[in-house]
Design a protein with these regions (language model features):
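Secretory targeting and sorting signals
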Residues: 1-16
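Serine-esterase "nucleophile elbow" of acetyl-processing enzymes
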Residues: 16-71, 119-124
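Structural recognition of the beta-strand scaffold that forms the well-ordered cores
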Residues: 21-26, 30-32, 64-69, 98-103, ...
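Oxyanion-hole/transition-state-stabilizing segment in secreted/luminal serine hydrolases
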Residues: 33, 83-145, 176
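A structural motif corresponding to the C-terminal end of an alpha-helix
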Residues: 56-64, 151-169, 204-222
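Charged, often glycine-rich, active-site loop that binds/positions anionic groups
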Residues: 73-90, 234-246
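A taxonomically broad motif for mature regions of secreted/extracellular
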Residues: 109, 124, 150, 198, ...
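Catalytic His-Asp segment of secreted/periplasmic serine-dependent ester chemistry enzymes
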Residues: 174-277
Length: 278
């Protein structure tokens, strides 16, 4: 839990002296959906938290943060308004932007929400036994990720580079949601045999993000290994992702510890540990 102290201790004397323009883009994993306190100046529909990974990074490094991440965003929302009062996310990027972080891709084609909802619905028909979701949907989710989500992420990253040519761009994968094999029905209402199936879908999504980063010169922030054992089936003091039961503000999303882990991982991978400049 040392990561909590790292990001809740306020700004530090060792942080960078000159403010550096830092822009955070993306979806609900990036915005810290459901984590209080919310950012009062952000559009309420974006569910942006003061404890999301970008705010953690900015606090430690004393960067000048422009956070336009928004819950529900997909790659099309980089170029068009997501909803009234929410500008295209690419509008936040400028030539003097030095760092860009983001999570994106999971909401394209509703892959993230749809796979979980459909598998939960299927599990209810078998009381959590067997693999009804896999039998019903087979390779359809992974095929969609590879044929549509992946090129969408590539285009989004290319657009980011075009708008912020002088920035380091880092895109994170999604934290592990389920254990490797054994689930926790009905806390996470996924049938026992569909746990590996959903893990395969998440692995395909993270791999699409990784490949897109490699193709566009962005840095991929891998969180799969470090989040093993901290999935939504773990105890409240161990999990980094919240379960569906009991009801909470943002199920199947990172809690504030998970966001802190994402922040620390970004700093480590980018070589921006405490006191190290960009």
């Amino acid at each position: 839990m040392a990561v909590i102290g790292l990001f809740l201790g306020g700004t530090a004397a060792w942080a960078d002296e000159a403010p550096l323009r830092y822009v955070n883009l993306g979806d609900s994993y990036s915005s810290g959906a459901g984590i209080q306190p919310a950012v009062a100046t952000a559009p309420p529909q974006c569910s942006q938290s003061q404890l999301n990974w970008a705010h953690d990074i900015a606090r430690v490094k004393r960067y000048q943060l422009v956070d336009v991440s928004c819950s529900g965003a997909d790659t099309s929302d980089f170029r068009a308004s997501q909803s009234p009062g929410v500008a295209p996310q690419l509008n936040a990027l400028t030539a003097d932007t030095k760092l860009v972080t983001l999570t994106i891709g999971g909401n394209d084609n509703s892959v993230f929400t749809s796979s979980i909802q459909k598998c939960a619905t299927a599990a209810a028909t078998t009381a959590g036994q067997g693999n009804p979701c896999q039998r019903a949907y087979g390779d359809s989710f992974v095929d969609t990720i590879n044929s549509s989500n992946y090129p969408n992420i590539v285009k989004a990253l290319k657009d980011v580079r075009a708008k912020a040519p002088n920035a380091r761009v880092a895109i994170s994968g999604y934290l592990t949601i389920l254990p490797a094999t054994q689930g926790c029905y009905p806390i996470m209402p996924i049938a026992a045999g569909d746990v590996p199936y959903l893990n395969g879908i998440q692995a395909a999504l993270n791999n699409a993000v990784k490949r897109a980063a490699q193709q566009t010169g962005a840095t991929y922030l891998d969180v799969t290994a470090i989040s093993q054992g901290h999935d939504a089936c773990q105890s409240p003091f161990k999990r980094w992702v919240e379960p569906i039961v009991p009801i909470n503000a943002a199920p199947v999303h990172p809690n504030f510890v998970g966001e802190g882990v994402m922040a620390k991982n970004a700093l480590d991978v980018l070589g921006l540990g405490i006191g190290i400049g960009l």
